[in-house]
């Protein structure tokens, strides 16, 4: 079963939310404030901690009557097991909710948007730079990496003045592996070699080497046309006339210049080419900016892809050489979907896909002190819960409520916990460090959950350290696994 918000989901009419006793007040408050466009009910099962549920246990303990009218059941996001087990028993769609109930409003907003999200019409060409200087193994590894990152075409970048006798074999190997291949060179012999081996795109031709394109007639190979060196857009005309006469498909690249070397003027050239040639295919080398701008590449790629989407530039060339551009191909893949959605839906590129928000968070979800005090009143076990907000860290259990705004000194917080078990101390130290980082960067913290780094976010811990520690501390497995017992997760 697809999680709520997945592409192709159906808008529900009535939703049944399943939760535990501790989370019930917060869940009801979130739903009340959300005022969702569907009817809903909340079912509180016989368990304190919702995160300790499994789908098998829910299937045994949940009671859904046909008269309830629910067409969607939302179970806790941290619940383990296959939701299909519940769906098969009750004949209703069952999906996991967000791991943090505070994300429910945004979660359902995304579900609606996701039904229209994911399409793209910008092709990504990923360049392997200085290919002649790399081993065959390194070239294949780079190509595999770029393809897995979302590249549509693998560009073999030749080096001017350096012989590349293996070019044909490299192109053939990549094509045999199911990849589409282009070659980046002005050298006519290298162009002929690569095309003979199966390359489908040539970067680039201008007045200096356009005659080689005559040899490509009938192959279906596309060429990228750039202005003559030092020339204006007017120098494109002669090359375009020849390519049209020879029936060679082409893309126009007016050349994106780095900041400090005419960046703004180069953007204007792209707009001018679109005005002069409204039907022409175009390419933009966005790597010229990401590689030469000391800034995280996520935002740079987002803006450049947005420009391409609005101008109808249907191909981009990028690479990942400098460290701050690592992940640029994946970023372009996310950006082309986001910007396609924004432009075609005539909306802002927000609220549907936050994977390009990496260092900061789209929203910082917190609890107030009153909410945490109310939560503490319902806790009966000594296991510590850790919370973070914009100003500090709170740690609480059934007896202690510790609050600190000095997040750079988590040792002071730890000293007040009275923990002497090494494993428990390690666990709490890890969580406090993560909470401190969240406060420092302005991110949402969720105990035992990975901080959000956008498309770079690692998976959450697969096994709850806190549950495991609870089991050991109490000397019995029942404490953490018997749903009738109080647990350790809120």
Residue ranges: model-predicted function:
Residues 1-117, 123, 342, 353-490:
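Long, compositionally biased, glycine/small-hydrophobic-enriched stretches that function as flexible linkers
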Residues 16-20, 30-37, 219-357:
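Catalytic alpha/beta core domains of metabolic enzymes, predominantly
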Residues 53-56, 78-85, 104-106, 160-172, ...:
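Active-site-adjacent beta->alpha loops and helix N-cap segments on the catalytic face
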Residues 54, 133-146, 186-187, 191, ...:
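Short, acidic/polar
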Residues 73, 150, 184, 252, ...:
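Conserved, mostly hydrophobic/aromatic
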Residues 91, 161-193, 216-225, 270-284, ...:
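Alpha-helix-loop-beta-strand connector modules within alpha/beta enzyme cores
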Residues 94-99, 154-160, 179-187, 199-213, ...:
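Catalytic beta/alpha-barrel core
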Residues 120-141, 228-232, 289-298:
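Active-site mouth loops of central-metabolism enzymes
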């Amino acid at each position: 079963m697809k999680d709520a918000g997945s592409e192709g989901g159906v808008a529900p009419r009535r939703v049944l939310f399943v939760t535990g006793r501790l989370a019930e007040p917060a869940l009801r408050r979130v739903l009340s404030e959300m005022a969702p466009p569907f009817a809903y009910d909340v079912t509180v099962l016989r368990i304190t901690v919702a995160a300790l549920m499994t789908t098998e246990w829910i299937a045994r303990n949940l009671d859904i009557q046909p008269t309830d009218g629910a067409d969607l059941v939302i179970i806790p996001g941290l619940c383990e097991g296959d939701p299909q087990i519940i769906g098969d028993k009750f004949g209703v769609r069952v999906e996991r909710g967000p791991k943090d109930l505070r994300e429910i409003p945004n979660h359902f907003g995304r579900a609606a948007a996701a039904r229209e999200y994911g399409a793209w019409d910008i092709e990504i060409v990923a360049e392997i730079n200085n290919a002649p200087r790399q081993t065959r193994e390194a070239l294949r590894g780079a190509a595999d990496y770029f393809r897995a990152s979302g590249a549509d075409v693998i560009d073999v970048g030749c080096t001017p003045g350096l012989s590349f006798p293996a070019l044909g074999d490299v192109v053939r190997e990549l094509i045999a592996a199911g990849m589409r291949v282009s070659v980046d060179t002005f050298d006519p012999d290298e162009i002929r070699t690569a095309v003979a081996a199966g390359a489908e795109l040539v970067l680039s031709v201008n007045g200096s080497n356009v005659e080689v394109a005559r040899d490509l007639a009938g192959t279906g190979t596309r060429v990228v046309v750039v202005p003559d060196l030092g020339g204006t857009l007017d120098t494109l005309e002669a090359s375009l006339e020849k390519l049209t006469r020879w029936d060679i498909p082409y893309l126009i690249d007016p050349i994106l210049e780095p900041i400090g070397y005419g960046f703004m003027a180069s953007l204007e050239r792209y707009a001018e080419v679109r005005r002069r040639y409204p039907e022409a295919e175009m390419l933009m080398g966005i790597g010229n900016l990401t590689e030469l701008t000391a800034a995280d590449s996520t935002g740079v790629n987002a803006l450049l892809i947005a420009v391409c989407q609005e101008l109808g530039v249907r191909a981009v060339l990028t690479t990942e050489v400098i460290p701050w551009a690592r992940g640029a191909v994946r970023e372009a893949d996310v950006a082309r979907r986001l910007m396609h959605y924004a432009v075609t839906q005539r909306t802002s590129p927000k609220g549907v896909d936050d994977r390009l928000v990496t260092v900061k968070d789209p929203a910082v979800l917190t609890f107030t002190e009153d909410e945490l005090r109310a939560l503490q009143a319902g806790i009966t076990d000594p296991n510590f819960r850790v919370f973070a907000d914009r100003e500090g860290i709170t740690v609480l259990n059934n007896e202690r409520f510790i609050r600190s705004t000095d997040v750079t000194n988590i040792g002071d917080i730890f000293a007040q916990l009275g923990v002497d078990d090494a494993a428990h101390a390690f666990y709490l130290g890890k969580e406090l460090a993560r909470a401190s980082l969240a406060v420092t960067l302005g991110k949402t913290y969720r105990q035992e959950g990975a901080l959000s780094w956008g498309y770079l976010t690692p998976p959450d811990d697969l096994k709850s350290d806190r549950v495991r520690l609870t089991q050991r501390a109490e000397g019995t497995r029942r404490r953490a696994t018997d749903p009738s017992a109080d647990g350790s997760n809120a």
